Amino acid sequence: CTPSGTICSPEAPEQCCSNSCVPHQWLRIFVCA
């Protein structure tokens, strides 16, 4: 799975180890929670 802090797709949160893909604090990307 994708570790925390790695870029991810909000449409596919299951790719993250945490099952959560969240907006980055200041960059316009999503990262695993």
From Swiss-Prot:
<comment type="function">
    <text>Inhibits trypsin (IC(50)=471 nM).</text>
</comment>
<keyword id="KW-1015">Disulfide bond</keyword>
<protein>
    <recommendedName>
        <fullName>Trypsin inhibitor 1</fullName>
    </recommendedName>
</protein>
<dbReference type="Pfam" id="PF17983">
    <property type="entry name" value="Tryp_inh"/>
</dbReference>
<keyword id="KW-0722">Serine protease inhibitor</keyword>
<feature type="disulfide bond">
    <location>
        <begin position="16"/>
        <end position="32"/>
    </location>
</feature>
<dbReference type="GO" id="GO:0010951">
    <property type="term" value="P:negative regulation of endopeptidase activity"/>
</dbReference>
<dbReference type="InterPro" id="IPR040875">
    <property type="entry name" value="Tryp_inh"/>
</dbReference>
<feature type="disulfide bond">
    <location>
        <begin position="1"/>
        <end position="17"/>
    </location>
</feature>
<keyword id="KW-0646">Protease inhibitor</keyword>
<feature type="site" description="Reactive bond for trypsin">
    <location>
        <begin position="28"/>
        <end position="29"/>
    </location>
</feature>
<feature type="disulfide bond">
    <location>
        <begin position="8"/>
        <end position="21"/>
    </location>
</feature>
<dbReference type="GO" id="GO:0004867">
    <property type="term" value="F:serine-type endopeptidase inhibitor activity"/>
</dbReference>
<comment type="similarity">
    <text>Belongs to the Mirabilis serine proteinase inhibitor family.</text>
</comment>
<keyword id="KW-0960">Knottin</keyword>
